[in-house]
C-alpha cells in the first residue's frame, strides 16, 4: 500500500513538473516574439529570470530531465532576448531626419569649410573641393565660369594665370 501511494505521488509530482516546465517554455517563446517586435528589453529579461528560478526549483525534485530541457531552452531564450534588446540601443545606429556633424559630409546649398567636401551653389574654401558657379581659392579646384588663381586649375571662358592651366577661347600665358 505504501508503494502504490508513493508511486502515485511521484506520477502526480512528475506530471505537475512537466506541466510547469512546459508553461515557462511557451511563455519564453511568446515573450521572445513580443520583445523582438516591440523591442522591450525589460519584459524579456524579467520573465526569463523568474521562469529560470521556477525551473531550477522543480529540477531539484526530478533529477536531470527537467533540468536539461529548461536549462538549454531558458539559456537560448535569455540570450535571444538580450540580443533583441541590445539591437535597439547601441553604437552604429541609423537615424533619419537628424543633423549629422562629421567629416566627409555632403551638404547642398551650404558653406563647406573642410577637406573632401562636396558643395553645390556655395563658396568652398578647402582643398580638393568641387564647386559649381562659385569662386574657388584652393589647389586642385575645378571651377566653371569663374576666375581660378591656383596651380593645376581648369577654367572655361576665363583668364587663367597659373602654371599648367588649360584655357579655352583666351590667350594663354604659359
Swiss-Prot record:
Top-level taxonomic group: Bacteria
Region entry Disordered: which residue ranges? Answer: 32-174
Locate the compositionally biased regions of type Polar residues. 102-174
Q: Where is the lipid attached (N-palmitoyl cysteine)?
A: 30
Q: Where is the lipid attached (S-diacylglycerol cysteine)?
A: 30
Q: Gly residues bias: where?
A: 50-75
Annotated GO CC locations: plasma membrane
Q: Where is this region: 7 X 12 AA tandem repeats?
A: 88-171
sequence repeat coordinates? 88-99, 100-111, 112-123, 124-135, 136-147, 148-159, 160-171
- Record keywords, A-Z: Cell membrane, Lipoprotein, Membrane, Palmitate, Repeat, Signal
Bias type Low complexity, positions: 38-49, 76-97
Question: From which residue to which does any coiled coil extend?
Answer: none
Membrane association type: Lipid-anchor
Q: Where, subcellularly, is it found?
A: Cell membrane
Which positions make up the signal peptide?
1-29
Q: What does this protein do?
A: Responsible for the antigenic diversity for host adaptation.
Miscellaneous comment in the UniProt entry for this protein: The numbers of repeats can vary and is one of the basis of the antigenic diversity.
The protein's name is: Variant surface antigen B
Amino acid at each position: 500500500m505504501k508503494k502504490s501511494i508513493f508511486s502515485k505521488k511521484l506520477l502526480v509530482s512528475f506530471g505537475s513538473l512537466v506541466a510547469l516546465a512546459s508553461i515557462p517554455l511557451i511563455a519564453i517563446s511568446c515573450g521572445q516574439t513580443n520583445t523582438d517586435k516591440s523591442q522591450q528589453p525589460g519584459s524579456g529579461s524579467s520573465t526569463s529570470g523568474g521562469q529560470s528560478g521556477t525551473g531550477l526549483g522543480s529540477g531539484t525534485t526530478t533529477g536531470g530531465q527537467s533540468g536539461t530541457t529548461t536549462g538549454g531552452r531558458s539559456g537560448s531564450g535569455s540570450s535571444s532576448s538580450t540580443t533583441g534588446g541590445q539591437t535597439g540601443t547601441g553604437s552604429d545606429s541609423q537615424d533619419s531626419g537628424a543633423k549629422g556633424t562629421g567629416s566627409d559630409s555632403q551638404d547642398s546649398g551650404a558653406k563647406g569649410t573642410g577637406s573632401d567636401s562636396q558643395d553645390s551653389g556655395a563658396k568652398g574654401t578647402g582643398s580638393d573641393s568641387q564647386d559649381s558657379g562659385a569662386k574657388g581659392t584652393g589647389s586642385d579646384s575645378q571651377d566653371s565660369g569663374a576666375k581660378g588663381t591656383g596651380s593645376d586649375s581648369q577654367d572655361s571662358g576665363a583668364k587663367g594665370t597659373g602654371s599648367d592651366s588649360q584655357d579655352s577661347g583666351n590667350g594663354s600665358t604659359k
